[in-house]
Amino acid sequence: MASAATTTHFPSSRIPSEPCASSGPLFPDDVLFTTEASSASSSSCHVENDSRPLSPTMFTDGRTPVNISAKHLKDHPLHEPTGTSEVLTFYPTMREFKNFSQYIKKIEQNGGHLKAGIAKIVAPEGWTPRPTRKDFSDVDDYEITQPARETIEATEKPGAYFKRNVTCRRKMPVREFRTLANSAQYRNPRPDLKGSEIEKHYFDNILHGEPIYGADTEGSFYDAQVEEWNMNRLGTILEDTNYEIKGVNTVYLYFGMYKTTFPWHAEDMDLYSINFLHFGAPKYWFAISSEHADRFERFMSQQFSYQNEYAPQCKAFLRHKTYLVTPELLRQAGIPYATMVQRPNEFIITFPRGYHMGFNLGYNLAESTNFASQRWIDYGKDAVLCDCNKDSVKIDMTHFMAKYRPDEYTTWWTYWYGGGRELWIPKKKKEVPKKRRQSLADASKIAKRARLGASSTATDSDGSSGSSGSEEATEGSSFMRALPAGYTVHNWQLRPDYDELLRKYKKETKLLRSDTRIDFYQEREFNHARRAEWPHCAVCQYFQPPHMNAINHTVPNSSRRLIPKWCFSKTDTKKHEDHHEPPPPLDRLLTCSNCHVTVHSHCCSGGGGGGGDDDDVTSSGEPWRCPRCRNRTDVEIRTTSCQLCELRGGALIPCQIGTDSTWAHVACALFNRRAIFDCPNRPGACFVEPSPRQQSETPRMPPRRLSEEYRAELGDLYENSRWECVVCHRTDEGLAPCVLCIEEQATTSLPTLAHVTCARRVGFVCEVRDYPRGVVMICHKHEHSYLVNKTTQQQAYTNVKVGDFVFVEDVVEPPQKLFTRGAIVRADKKETVVVDFLDNSCSRDNHVEDIISCECLFCENGDHQYGARVKVVWDDKQVYDAYFRGKGQMIEYTVRLEDGREVRHPRNRLKTKRELNAYLKK
């Protein structure tokens, strides 16, 4: 079998998208490499300082043979994978081995970081880090600093364990440690075991014994003159830090004995790490790729939430290195993991945010440190850090961002360090005097009786109209009158009480958070309660403002959809359609027989039985189930949660992000600008493009791709970086930005960002806009911002008064503009309404009577509910859909033109002579 140096290069059409796992070794012809590499001679592939990241290398997934000498293979036997994924093992030549950073690039170009979060590198045959010495006899004279006795405790959750360390000595000579490690009390009782037998024996006896670990001892056993992979000078960008961080940019030694354990963790600041085993018994590793890191963190938080003693209180609790779970629990949760055995003269590389744990199989010595590449910067810039331990590692990323990410630097620094991150604290609730409370309660009852009179008439369908009660009591509430009998108004505020909703948020979501113990009963109760709210669909409800709740506990067979089809397709399907399309049709409502979630058949049927127009049962006669509950085990159903937010409940569909097969709320996928649905009509799954820092792709993406116009409409900062949700304070990618913040704030400031599920809980409104904006979220900061903007707009104009001469734009054929001179004869204060149109424009000078209909649950005298859908007559006499923002005031000027006509206009439609000259010069 040919070695890497004599590999024949094949056309790129044969190159797979990921490393091949078929029979035979994985050679360069199985992986992608550059045109230059393909045309170069085989000898040029091994230049000492080769700058090409994809030059040949040899690796295996453990199931395929490798072309190395028999002696080398005996010293470094292949590890047959025992997990659900594989760790790739690489075999560099001596020439490749000379350039550390370049070889790490090769590993990542070959997908080594995606398989399991770690990779093994077997040092070239004959290489040693100590060429001046033949043995390690000098190690006995070394002193271990603060060796720790390990105790592992069982938790209430079977298969979940907690590790404690107690320093047993201030110092211990290695000679004494070696004697202890090889004694009958501490040595490995079954060194003959292989593969999964090693794992089983370890976890079966995990609670027995208290081994001593000589970890985190400063020092190195490399010869100073060794250049290759010398941990004291790896030459990566981490050396740009101008201060020493013990064990991070310095080297630590690890003296192990059987069963000494390093629990699940990712490296400090999500750095890379390198671990080299000098001598002794192997290390046994478990690893999880960064593609599954979010899901793994959520899973671990769930497992340890059953007992207060072990429940995580820190957002970065896994950095404590105290939590362990069995492989069986990972299998049950569907989290891919891999295993690897590390032997002497072998390196293990861990990648940014790659989780790993392991244990030693006997007395051994390893050394380790951290390093970085430019790819790491995108992890380190928003790494979630431990704040409960004063000794936790923190690296100032300012230098790295300024030097390597100059385009992002200002926005990043302003957000994290310059006061740009919003800390929303609800205002203290004021105590209302008892007499005042009574008068408010009486007024509330009177108003409520008037409103409920509007819903006392039965109708045949959700969209038909009826009338009842006095005209005064139902003024402006035609939408409420149109609802069938049985609806009551539980929340009728003109504007959401954001602070009150935020105060309730933590209590109401405590049992629905996806990082706490699983409680499927609470999810069902939540879904059952939510389905009573009009329009009853768990997806469309996001587009009905939460302060406008109409409740009917008898769910109808159908209701109106609030989300147009193009929002699911995320394409410009309206380009050639009539702007004034008819109202969305009624759509059949389906309720899952298992989790009780209710959805429109076109919002989330998943293509299963019951998605048709005539039945809500499967072809076999079974009651309809949602995609989450369909053809899945009880364990799978209960452990399902959304990958794009932090809350349980609601309509979930399968979601593929890179190679991670997970789940997402339909609503979360609607707002995520990297997500695309498998089908815009009755979506059953979604696919999300992974962050560029992952260097991966999502397989099986639909051929219909997201356009650059859509993806770039709000920028890519929110999708490609992790920011903090203003509501739950969790740090995630893909948070929904407030669209009004984007329009009103400085370019260096980030808008309010939130998970859409959190946003609706605290009163933020979700609305539909024309392509390419799509669905948008509006935060709490804009409840009265239209008044501020109005004042600012008025100040931009010169004051005019009765008697002044002005110029008015007259009506002519576009694009011509004709300005007619006239005199102001009257100025009247007028009440106006502020509305946002679907084309993203905002009008601030419409008259109250320009709104001809609304979907408020109750309104009077032109006071509509904030965020209500309204229909507005524009100057062209056409009717347009819009969202109500508020009421204001303007001065309307009556101008008598020179031809005798009188016209009425607001100030922004008039120009003084100076303003006209400036306009014409443009």
Swiss-Prot record:
Q: What note does UniProt attach to the cofactor annotation? A: Binds 1 Fe(2+) ion per subunit.
Q: Which Gene3D superfamilies match?
A: 3.10.330.70, Cupin
Q: Where are the zinc fingers (PHD-type)?
A: 723-783
Provide this UniProt record's keywords sorted from A to Z.
Chromatin regulator, Dioxygenase, Iron, Metal-binding, Nucleus, Oxidoreductase, Transcription, Transcription regulation, Zinc, Zinc-finger
The JmjC domain extends over 223-388
Compartment annotation: Nucleus
Q: Where does Fe cation bind?
A: H265, E267, H356
Task: Give the protein name, as stated in the record.
Answer: Lysine-specific demethylase 4
A single BP term in Gene Ontology: negative regulation of DNA-templated transcription
Listed Pfam families: JmjC (PF02373), JmjN (PF02375)
User: Which species?
Assistant: Caenorhabditis elegans
Q: What is its EC number?
A: 1.14.11.66, 1.14.11.69
Function summary: Histone demethylase that specifically demethylates 'Lys-9' and 'Lys-36' residues of histone H3, thereby playing a central role in histone code. Demethylation of Lys residue generates formaldehyde and succinate. Involved in the negative regulation of lifespan in a germline-dependent fashion.
Domain JmjN, chain residue ranges per copy: 87-130
Region annotation (Disordered) ranges: 1-21, 42-61, 435-475
